[in-house]
């Protein structure tokens, strides 16, 4: 079993075997979906339990699963890194709002390559996942990394096998930087991968990369950091080489408007700016405007209200980017559309 380092000593940890589908933490508010925000939702949940006595049962099953579960009304809230369209939200009577911003990072298992030692760009990353670049000492990779000793080793690509918002962010980026990727594969929570092996969840991808020599995968940055995986730097839209740090993830949102009229559905991939990480995204929560269980939905919103007010430092500690106070107030203000929400 591949152990993901405990986020909170003696409290909530993440464990995953390769292919393991679900990570769960205990108790009273029910949610399901994206694995991208699971580390921060777990940390918030532990702290919130301590101050309120209320727990959170969140199934980290992927964005596709979260959307299905909220649509089937089996959980109080769904979670997705792919924002739903206004038409989709209206069809199901859902309200959507973002919680934090994070970064999707390529991670590699290449002999002698330390975290941050390798640089890739979007076109090269797309060609690796298409299968056009199949060895680590390919001239294209060597040109980006003249001082790195790259082995004559076959590249094994690892991707998500489940419906995944992380996949949506990653493939949306590749579609913007590679015309061939856009025409052959496109972007969605699940795509027909040209090459490679699949794994469930960010946890599963991290585990596969750690165990497979010569591999490359993509995970939310907290998973790379917690598992000591060798992440790459990226050349961004402005041609600048940037490291995956919170400031770079936040820079991707510099021009975002975060409009409640479209469910705050802003994409942050391939944004301009010298300091911008190119594969960034927000993660979203979905609740019903007219919930069957108003009390449960009210408790879920109280949890996120508490997180907005007191959880920024915890989010920053895991390299997520909290929203500015003005945006948080706009988000909380949108909750008046939820029947039974009384503001606290």
Language-model region placement:
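Bacterial N-terminal signal peptides that target proteins for export
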Residues: 1-12
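Flexible loop/hinge segments at secondary-structure junctions
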Residues: 25-344
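Assembly/oligomerization scaffold segments
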Residues: 2-4, 20, 79-80
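C-terminal segment of classical bacterial N-terminal signal peptides
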Residues: 14-25
């Amino acid at each position: 079993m591949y152990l993901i380092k405990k986020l909170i000593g003696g409290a909530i940890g993440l464990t995953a075997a390769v292919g393991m589908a679900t990570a769960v933490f205990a108790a009273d508010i029910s949610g399901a979906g994206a694995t991208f925000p699971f580390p921060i939702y777990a940390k918030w949940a532990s702290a919130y339990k301590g101050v309120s006595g209320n727990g959170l049962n969140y199934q980290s099953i992927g964005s596709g699963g979260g959307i299905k579960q909220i649509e089937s009304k089996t959980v109080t809230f769904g979670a997705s890194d792919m924002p739903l369209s206004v038409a989709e939200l209206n069809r199901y009577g859902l309200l959507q709002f973002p919680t934090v911003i994070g970064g999707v990072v390529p991670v590699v298992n290449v002999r002698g390559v330390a975290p941050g030692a390798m640089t890739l760009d979007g076109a090269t990353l797309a060609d690796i996942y298409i299968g056009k670049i199949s060895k680590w000492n390919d001239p294209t990779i060597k040109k980006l990394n003249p001082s790195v000793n790259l082995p004559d080793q076959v590249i094994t690509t690892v991707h998500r096998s489940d419906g995944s918002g992380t996949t949506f962010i990653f493939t949306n980026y590749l579609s913007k930087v590679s015309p061939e990727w856009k025409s052959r594969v496109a972007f969605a929570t699940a795509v027909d991968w040209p090459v490679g092996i699949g794994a469930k969840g960010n946890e599963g991808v991290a585990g596969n990369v750690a165990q497979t020599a010569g591999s490359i995968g993509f995970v939310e940055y907290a998973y790379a950091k917690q598992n000591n995986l060798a992440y790459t730097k990226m050349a961004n839209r402005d041609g600048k080489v940037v490291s995956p740090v919170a400031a770079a993830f936040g820079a991707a949102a510099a021009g975002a408007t975060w409009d409640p009229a479209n469910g705050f559905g802003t994409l942050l991939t391939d944004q301009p700016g010298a300091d911008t990480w190119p594969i960034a995204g927000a993660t979203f929560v979905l609740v019903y405007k007219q919930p069957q269980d108003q009390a449960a939905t009210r408790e879920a919103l109280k949890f996120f209200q508490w997180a907005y007010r007191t959880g920024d430092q915890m989010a920053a500690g895991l390299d997520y980017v909290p929203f500015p106070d003005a945006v948080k107030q706009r988000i909380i203000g949108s909750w008046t559309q939820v029947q039974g929400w009384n503001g606290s």
